Amino acid sequence: MLGVTNTTRSLREFWCTELPDHIVGLAFRPDAGLFAAASVTGPIHVLSATDGAPHALFAGHGFGTSGISWSADGTLLASIGQDGVVKAWDVARKDMAWSGEATAPWAERAAWSADGTLLAVAAGKLVRLWNRQGQLLRTFGPHSSTVLDIAWKPQSRQLAATSYGCVTLWDADQPEPVRTYRWQGSSLVLAWSPDGRYLATGDQDATVHFWITKTGRDYQMSGYPRKVKELSWDGSSRWLATGGGSQACVWDCSPPGPNDREPLILEAHDRSLTTLAFQHRRELLATGGAEGRVMIWRPSRGRGAVSASEEGPAITQLAWSPDDQVLAAGDEAGRVRLFRVLK
């Protein structure tokens, strides 16, 4: 097995539950007591993070759920789907708090602001903002093409949105863009560094684009076997992990930037790497593959995996608990497993 050495430990789950279908979303509540799992057919399960006991079951979206996001205080769980509707679920009452139209046949992304007061939703060429009470506050766009991803700048009211040829930066309190980062290509995903200094995109043309946000200076990293749909920053904002093949490429983005540096290549999976996620504040990187294996890495100390699970159905989602001690993994068969990863 690639990446596995004689020091690689077995990664063992402390509980597992089986849901009806392919997992498309996993998210821990900010207090880590509950987490939500969304399936491709629509239902959203809210489970105890301790033992997997059911807490609530929400209907989700009739044509399938495409994304979920917790508010900062953990009271509301937002969901979007192929029905073009955004919904906010009251987790304590176990009922829907409100819903709104996303203005397109399907919604691509939903994300709460860091303070939990604003919910952003991307649908078609528009991005819309709602408050916690379900009041529509603002509509951004139309953009140059379908907005495939959005992300709030850390600890800020600024929101980045991808469309063909650019990343557009909006301020929640202004009707016009704050800044536009241009390049000729189509970005599929974007990720802010935790300190807000850098913005990275994974792209349709099998590249990664990287901006220093203050100056607008940009870099492009190429050579990936396929389009790049997996990005994750470590908590220090130094390391950017990327997919785009069977390997994980980890770039050193400390000043002056990743240009002219060779990435650390982690020989991660026998088949395609499907998802990856750094811990929030620590140094461990989790990867999941099409062969069903979950692997844990410490890139700062070399190329060998720290621990690895057994193979199974393809991994579709990974999520770290807020305290970085538990890793959740969802797969294409509907299985959700939790692993305890202390250090």
Predicted regions and their residues:
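WD40-repeat beta-propeller superdomains and closely related acidic/aromatic-rich repeat-like regions
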Residues: 1-343
